[in-house]
Amino acid sequence: IPMRHRSVVPLLALILMLPASSGAQDTRPGIAVMPFQNGGSYGQDKENFDALERGIAGMLISELSQNPAARVVERENVQRLLDEQDLGADGRVDAATAAKVGKLVGARYMVMGTFVDLYGRFRVDARLVDVETSEILKVVRSDPKLEKREEMFRLLQALAERLMAESKLPPLSSEVSQAAKARNVPTEALTYYSRALLYQDRGDKAKATEYFNKAITAFPNYAEAQEGLKKVSGA
């Protein structure tokens, strides 16, 4: 090849590769979950309720991630943005704030909401927000048949299913759905997991490690707690 044409070849190759690169982008709708807010709970240690703000979000993210048609944003990415931008510092997060966070993490939908635990009677209200318009598309309330604190995991599973439907996602395959229903995380383990996330966000690795381990002891097959333990230990 003549010298003057040699530099053109790599450039041409690069141009030819560009459509393939852009075509490989993830076009699935992004969903992100904000920390849930305590709507006025009684009967437990306050630290448990503070922790559930993270834990409910963490478990909903895990359940939504079962659907391959969605791109679910990691909880830590949302929390990092909230901390960096001091969003929701007053304890209140509205749809506009959620939409702002959603745009920053590249989500189409944001999930936000509140929970109330009145001496063991548990309720969760979730709101699905359109990131483009800041509009609340749907308020999804937990199944009134699942109101006991001991049924928290089943309650969150059912809530995630409804959020998938409201986000126009296809239902889970029967195989994935059956595997999900075969799993039931005890509330004790979920509480420990929530505490671990709280300490992780506070930068207390020792406490986070302790509570991830407690969650795994209470439920040895707790994949989310095992993954959390790897993150805080740097494995």
Describe each region flagged by the PLM.
Residues 181-200:
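Alpha-helical tetratricopeptide repeat
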Residues 79-186:
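Catalytic-center loop of serine/cysteine hydrolases
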Residues 26-95, 110-117, 139, 178-181:
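Short beta-strand->alpha-helix linker/helix-N-cap micro-motif
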